[in-house]
Structures are given as structure tokens and as C-alpha cells.
Amino acid sequence: MTNLNYQQTHFVMSAPDIRHLPSDTGIEVAFAGRSNAGKSSALNTLTNQKSLARTSKTPGRTQLINLFEVADGKRLVDLPGYGYAEVPEEMKRKWQRALGEYLEKRHSLQGLVVLMDIRHPLKDLDQQMIEWAVDSNIAVLVLLTKADKLASGARKAQLNMVREAVLAFNGDVQVETFSSLKKQGVDKLRQKLDTWFSEMQPVEETQDGE
């Protein structure tokens, strides 16, 4: 297994939808989560870069698909945050369409990291993301973020509860706790990404450009 240097991750581009993304080759691992789940903080902690992914003070600001390259043909994808109450309904629907389309049609997408606040896990949209991924044979890592907000016993109880709940999806779904503040769970995240990037088959360029 290759240990990638995530500190070398750099921003490639932003796209409003799947049609504007670069060619569907290599391996992509996407990060998804509700607008306040700590997605940007997790990406910044993973790569040890303070501002790789912009942490917005206004949840719901990240409306684009953001691509980052870790190494040649190995990319991390920051998907638009979902479920923020103050975003207009029309925009919410647009994002959900873009998310669904990306998860179902992007062949190079081979792993999905779903981030949830450990205090409020498995909301409807979180479950929908996991369901979409499992239906598309995409491996899932659930990160229960802001784990430092709970005492050790409560943290363990939440972890066990979510691990039990995801069995119902009948897919490759792993659950771990994570804290950007305390750097907790970062090694497990890196190990999982290394495994995915090492063991999964990169998508090659096709003649018709699909």
C-alpha cells in the first residue's frame, strides 16, 4: 500500500456540475456532508493546510464541486454542503441534482467520505448519500466529526449506535470518530484513503471520451 503525502494536495478547479469536471479518469474520493458538519476543516486537517478548503462562516456557501489533486490521477473532491435551512429551495434542489448525478455517473468516484456531526448523525440526507453510494458500489467511510464535543463515554455510545445503524445499508460502510480540533481520527482517515487509492482500479481514458 502506498502512503501518499496529503500535504502535497493542491486545488485544481471548481465546477458547478458534473459536465464541467475534467475527464473521468483515475481515482476520486469525495467528501460530502451537511453544511455544518466540518467538511472543510476535515480536508484542511487531513492535508495539514490551513486554507486548502475554505471554511465559510456562512454554512451553505460552498455551492460548487471542488477538485484537489493528491498525486497524479488521485483526486479528492469536496462536494457542496447539503441540508442548510436558509438556502432557497430552488438552490437546494439544484445541489441535490448535482450530487445525485455525480454519485451515479462519475466512474472514477470510488470512495465516499460522509461527515456528520457526532451529536446529530444520520439525518435524512446523510442516509440518502450512503444509500446512493452503496447502490453505486462505492465504498463509504462515515466520519463522526466534532468528537471532542462529547465526553469519552458518550462518544463511544454514539459510535456504536451509528455502526449498528449503518449495517442496514448492506454495503461497504465503515464508521469512525473524528475531531479536526484534536486531530483525532486523522490517521484512520489517511489509512482508509491510502487503501482506496492503492487498491482500487483507476479508470482509463475511453475512446468516446466518456
Swiss-Prot record:
Recorded GO MF terms: GTP binding; metal ion binding
Function statement: Necessary for normal cell division and for the maintenance of normal septation.
Binding-site residues, GTP: 33-40, 60-64, 78-81, 145-148, 178-180
Required cofactor names: Mg(2+)
Occurrences of domain EngB-type G (ranges): 25-199
UniProt-listed PANTHER family: ENGB-TYPE G DOMAIN-CONTAINING PROTEIN, MSS1/TRME-RELATED GTP-BINDING PROTEIN
CDD domains given in the database record: YihA_EngB (cd01876)
One BP annotation, GO: division septum assembly
Gene giving rise to this polypeptide: engB
Family: Belongs to the TRAFAC class TrmE-Era-EngA-EngB-Septin-like GTPase superfamily. EngB GTPase family.
Protein keywords: Cell cycle, Cell division, GTP-binding, Magnesium, Metal-binding, Nucleotide-binding, Septation
Name assigned to this protein: Probable GTP-binding protein EngB
A single Gene Ontology CC term: cytosol
Positions that bind Mg(2+): S40, T62
